[in-house]
A protein has these predicted regions:
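C-terminal edge-of-domain segments
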Residues: 127-157
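Short, aromatic/basic amphipathic alpha-helical patches
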Residues: 115-129
Length: 157
């Protein structure tokens, strides 16, 4: 797994810029309310601006980033996906991993809808390489512990 992944680092930068702009917009909203009131044209314009300021990433992209960041925090040698993906998220998730240069990932989700994701991965061109066990490091109550986790390894084709 690429620990210093420029692709994901750029996502982080853009996300932080979005958050800073959102905080600034919220501060401006309060200034508009204080200076012009609730029924002002300025506040209506602010609402239009805020509605246009959509978060830059779809949820599948966010889940790919979170899987990468969490895998790094857990000191894993390979990307682990432990979350369920909705049908609308699968393509964005996999395209994001491909864009980041990730070649394989281990799917460890244990929800009742795992089969949906397995078939969706195959439909999007992934190859199931087989069952595997990975080791993750977690910090619980201040103690670092190693955990063996069962999963299915996929190759991104």
């Amino acid at each position: 797994m690429l620990i210093n992944n420029a692709y994901f680092e750029n996502f982080k930068r853009i996300g932080r810029e979005y958050e800073a702009a959102r905080v600034e917009r919220q501060a401006r909203k309060q200034q508009i309310i204080d200076n012009y009131g609730w029924d002002s044209a300025e506040l209506k314009a602010w609402y239009e601006e805020d509605a246009a300021a959509k978060f830059p990433y779809e949820s599948g992209v966010c889940k790919a980033y979170r899987a990468w960041a969490t895998s790094i925090c857990r000191k894993e040698t390979e990307l682990e996906m432990d979350d369920f993906l909705w049908e609308k998220e699968v393509r964005d998730f996999l395209e994001t991993l491909r864009g980041a240069g990730i070649e394989t990932f281990v799917y460890t989700n244990q929800s009742t809808a795992v089969m949906e994701n397995l078939h969706a991965f195959a439909a999007e061109g992934c190859t199931m390489l087989g069952l595997c066990t990975i080791t993750r490091q977690e910090t619980r109550w201040g103690e670092e512990e190693l955990y063996e986790v069962q999963g299915i390894r996929f190759r991104l084709n």
